[in-house]
Design a protein with these regions (language model features):
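Helix-loop-helix junctions that connect adjacent transmembrane helices in secondary transporters/permeases
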Residues: 76, 139-224
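Short beta-strand-initiation
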Residues: 24, 35, 91, 101, ...
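A generic short-segment signal for beta-strand/edge and adjacent turn/coil regions
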Residues: 4-11, 34-35, 65-77, 160-166, ...
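Residue-level recognition of conserved structural "scaffold" positions that shape functional pockets
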Residues: 28, 168, 246-250
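Short hydrophobic/aromatic-rich motifs at helix boundaries and adjacent loops
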Residues: 24-27, 85-90, 164, 189-192, ...
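Alpha-helical support elements that line or immediately flank enzyme active sites
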Residues: 39-69, 103-125, 193-256
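Exposed boundary/loop context
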Residues: 14, 154, 232-236
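Flexible, low-hydrophobicity surface segments
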Residues: 1-149
Length: 256
C-alpha cells in the first residue's frame, strides 16, 4: 500500500471528533432567547384552503401565508430545455398540493409548546381529487397540480436524429416499459434551521443543515428581498443528505 498519491490509504479526519461526541449539528446549537418553531402540515394530498383560524389571544405566535405577503415564493426553475417553471410558496396559500405541505408556523419557548399550539389551529380545506400515479396524471381529465397549467407535464424533451431509420436497420430490437419507484432519502439527521439577525454586522445569519450553502443564500436573497451580502449561511456538521439537502426548503424561508 502506498503512503501517498493514488492508491494511498487516507485516514478520515472527522471520525475521532464524532466518535467522542464533539460534533456540532444544528440541533446542538443554542443561544439566548432562542425560540422553537413547529409547522402545521396538510394531511390531504390535494385541497383548496377555505380558512385557517388562529386560536384567540395567540395570533402573534402563529404565522400563515397571509402574514408573508411580502415574501416571494420559491421559483422552481431549471436550465433543462423544455422545463416548465412554477412557484412554490413558503406556506400554502390557495390550495395544498401534497401531504405534509406547510400551512402554518407556530412559535413557542419549547418544542412541545410549539406542537401544542399547532394543534389549536382550525383549518377548513375542501378536499379535491388527487392522483399519485404519474401515468394517470397525464390523462386529459386528471386533476391539475397548478390551476393555471393546461396539464401536469413539467418537462417535455426530445431526441435529435433519424431514430426511425436507425430502428428499422437495427439487428436487434428490444421494447421495454420501464418504471422507477419514488425516491426518498433518509439521512440520520433531518432538516434543521436556526436563524437570527446580527445587528453588529447587519446580516441575517442562518445555520442550516444543507449541502449547498451558496444556493441557500441565493434563494433566501430572492425570496426575502435582501442582498446576498446581507445573508450569511453557515452549514455546521451535516448528518447525511444524499441530495435531500441540495435544495432550498420552504421551512428555511419561514424560519429566516
Amino acid at each position: 500500500m502506498l503512503d501517498q498519491g493514488i492508491g494511498a490509504r487516507v485516514l478520515r479526519k472527522e471520525d475521532d471528533r464524532h466518535l467522542h461526541g464533539r460534533g456540532q449539528f444544528v440541533g446542538d446549537l443554542a443561544m439566548k432567547g432562542l425560540k422553537e418553531v413547529a409547522f402545521l402540515r396538510s394531511n390531504l394530498a390535494h385541497g383548496r384552503i377555505r380558512t385557517i383560524s388562529k386560536p384567540a389571544g395567540k395570533e402573534a405566535l402563529i404565522v400563515t401565508a397571509a402574514d408573508l405577503k411580502t415574501i416571494k415564493p420559491i421559483f422552481a426553475d431549471s436550465s433543462i430545455p423544455g422545463f416548465k417553471a412554477s412557484n412554490y410558496p413558503a406556506l400554502a396559500t390557495d390550495k395544498v398540493r401534497f401531504v405534509g405541505e406547510c400551512l402554518a408556523a407556530c412559535i413557542a419557548d419549547t418544542r412541545a409548546a410549539a406542537e401544542d399550539l399547532a394543534e389549536e389551529i382550525e383549518v377548513d380545506i375542501e378536499e379535491l381529487p388527487a392522483v399519485i400515479d404519474s401515468l394517470k396524471a397525464r390523462a386529459p381529465d386528471a386533476p391539475l397540480v397548478h390551476d393555471d397549467w393546461s396539464d401536469n407535464l413539467f418537462l417535455t424533451t426530445s431526441v435529435q436524429g433519424d431514430i426511425e431509420t436507425l430502428a428499422k436497420t437495427a439487428p436487434v430490437k428490444v421494447t421495454r416499459e420501464l418504471r422507477t419507484g419514488r425516491q426518498c432519502m433518509h439521512p440520520m439527521e433531518g432538516k434543521g434551521v436556526l436563524a437570527y439577525w446580527d445587528f453588529q454586522s447587519g446580516q441575517l445569519v442562518v445555520y442550516t443543515s444543507t449541502q449547498v450553502p451558496h444556493m441557500i443564500r441565493t434563494g433566501l436573497s430572492e425570496t426575502l428581498g435582501l442582498e446576498q451580502r446581507q445573508i450569511r449561511v453557515i452549514p455546521p456538521d451535516v448528518g447525511g443528505g444524499f441530495g435531500y439537502k441540495c435544495v432550498l426548503q420552504p421551512e428555511e424561508i419561514v424560519i429566516a
